Amino acid sequence: MTEPLIRFENLYKVYGSDPRSVMPLVREGHSKDEILAETGHTLGLRDINLEIEKGQIFVIMGLSGSGQSTLVRHLNRLIDPTEGAIYVGGIDVMNLSQTELEDFRCHRMSMVFQRFGLLPHRTVLENVAFGLSIQKIAKAEREEKAREWLRSVGLDGYEDQYPSQLSGGQQQRVGLARALCTDPEILLMDEPFSSLDRLIRSGMQDLLVELQDKLHKTIVFITHDLDEALRLGHQIAILKDGVLSQVGRPEEILRNSADDYVEAFVRDVNRARGLSTITNP
């Protein structure tokens, strides 16, 4: 059996002044609200065990505050867990030195943000090439690669524009090109299309599917939109208050909801239409 590329084991995250002191209550099953009321600490994640296969688009869903962004930010250690282990390609991410962690972030993964995260004082070309400049790639080489990625996302000819001159959809294309320009193994996408109008959003989904068919990256994708999750995901994980409610293929989520919380997500979906939108077999 193939080893998963990403593995979370018994992952817990508690926010507050003394998170470890709260762990006995967490293990006893106290709710998020109870822990906050009793200790002033906030439960972010509770006992997450999750595997993500290489080459998948893995979608993470949940209501706001359910822990999706917290979970994803553990992968590159923008957030460290209170307890638990994180493995990427067999490497224990928690054991990386600061130098190793910086190299890991530079070369193994990239992020695409909801609010684009572009540098306003740099041109489109400079924004796309930014990650390569951090890697100290020669200017001519990084600009050549940046131009290639701009062509790939349909922005050939926009190299000398500035982010403020672009539409929201165009800015997110720049963000996607920038993330891919460093050739990362893993792409972390935190609600990347949620601020776009529906038509532009659909076009960005099409572009992502088209690029993924060619590149076969491992993509961890956060969304609140079930239609988007069904269209993009090989697997979907649904979180509630930092706990995994269900993990499964899109059709499993639609047909066999694990609990009332998951059922609430799929209740208003036309199931026949939802099944027909599933892109990934």
Language model features by range: what are they?
Residues 181-185:
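A short, proline-enriched helix->beta-strand linker immediately N-terminal to the Walker B motif
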Residues 162-166, 170:
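Conserved ABC ATPase signature
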Residues 241-242:
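Conserved ABC ATPase "signature" C-loop
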Residues 84-92:
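Conserved ABC transporter NBD signature motif
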Residues 247-248, 256:
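ABC ATPase "signature
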Residues 7, 24-34, 91-92, 129, ...:
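Conserved ABC ATPase "signature" region
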Residues 76:
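Helix-to-loop junction immediately C-terminal to a conserved catalytic motif
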